[in-house]
Amino acid sequence: LLVRFEKLLESDAPLAEVLPSIYKQHEERYAGYTLRQLCQEMHDLYARHNVKQLQKEMFRKEHFPRVSMNPQEANYAYLRGEVELVRLPDAEGRIAAEGALPYPPGVLCVVPGEIWGGAVLRYFSALEEGINLLPGFAPELQGVYIEEHDGRKQVWCYVIKPRDAQSTLLKGEKL
């Protein structure tokens, strides 16, 4: 299968022949495209965002997100509704209410109670750009949500509300 793919790449085969279902779903975007063009755009996207380095940093201790809250406490806050859904750029510096996982690699990159930022935020931002630039090739994402606004898909996530914004009606509530 890999040898066949390499031959298709070398011959610069039309995308409509190589990936017909994706081509049909996004014909306007990929009209006249070849496999080599698509691969080059993917490569350029990952190089522009230095995704290889971001993937390394996300799983090295010195780059882990800062822990601000016990994961169980963050989960309880989520269950009590002490959260707000924000666009990914607005999550920077905020406490994650849910774990976020892109597949691949299929490993949590931020867990409840950690601060959104650094390599994790930049990685998810790169994925958001890829979802928009290359329709049909979106990774599976868990713990974040894709919503379309003004013709663009945006990544949103739940973060813990600041203490002063949380409802006073919840005082004394126990789970």
What residue spans do the PLM features occupy?
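Non-catalytic terminal extensions of PLP-dependent enzymes
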Residues: L1-L175
